[in-house]
Amino acid sequence: MKKNYLFALTLTMWLLSCAAAEDPNKAALKLNPKPNLMNIITDTATFGEGCFWCTEAFFQRLKGVKEVLSGYGGGFVENPTYEQVCDKNTGHIELARIVFDPNEISYDELLEVFWKTHDPTTMDQQGNDIGPQYRSAIYYHNAEQKQKAEKYKAALDKSGAWAKPIVTIIEPFKNFYPAENYHQNYYNNNQNQGYCRFVIAPKLEKFEKVFKDKLKKQ
């Protein structure tokens, strides 16, 4: 009986893990349409806050965000696959590359969302997602982003908002490799999948209450 219970518990934890991906050959995937950015001055932010399915879902909903792409970065293997990253031997982190219009939403506002939508005190872990690919990370693209990220982190540390030290890495942007197509627009394509229903959906509900004034109109 105990063995059956442990098996059921292990299976449940796996089903609620970001690593339990859908079949990559699944048909009828809906990718986000590429926005026309020719006449818009945009900037880029690159964040890692655990499973990129969650990160993508948060930032997609913000006014001023033009594109969110899930991918891998920070490591040393070129064009890694999801399986390689999950093997934890590439040095890569699951990331979201966020293209935004700074006239509609600022980098400071994106940082606020970043810090408030994950636990920056757990090393290589977010909930049931465990491994170096789930590290909390900010990859800055210029000196101004570096200064703002470090200032926000220092203020959080000083405020005592978290009982444990913040372990988020703040490093210069190194590289970014887009993830496979089935990872893109993941929550919107797979809302009935277990991880989406039981992990992402409750987080989104909370997110939409906290940031209701910053959301795109549905």
Model-based region annotation:
Residues 18-218:
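Flexible coil/turn and secondary-structure edge motifs
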Residues 1-27:
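Bacterial Sec-dependent N-terminal signal peptides
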